Amino acid sequence: VADMLVARGVVSREELAGRADPAPSPLAEKALKAPQVAGVLARGGPADRPSDIAAIFAPGDAVVTRKQPENTIVPGGHTRLPAYAAGAKGRVLRLHGTHVLPDSNAHDLGEAPEPLYAVAFPASELWAHPEHPRDEVVLDLWQSYLEAP
């Protein structure tokens, strides 16, 4: 994280080492006041983008997540596919449109937008002995995480 902050100019190596008197950061002007935080978080960050990748699933479709919950672009890299949902069967609730793929974007490899779906999984599909077997867990998952059963 420190290397990323230095590379992006947020802090210097001297500041991290405690040897420099930090100059006022241009980010300080963007700092939210306490009353603003809830409203900003409720709006979220805009991550929807245009994409040439067509949605291949529709609401009601059965899907299965990839068996390996790993980043297929960067070995050992960031992914939003939870390990507990790897290989699980679910159904598409809705298509959110196309959004930035974190597996690529988190590693400065571009936004690589692709379709993002809300997928419902029965609790019994995710855990061997769920407290309430008829409960559902809904995950927002990118198209590259999903396959047809």
Segments and roles (model prediction):
Residues 20, 24, 35, 111-114:
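A sequence-level detector of short, solvent-exposed, charge-rich linear segments
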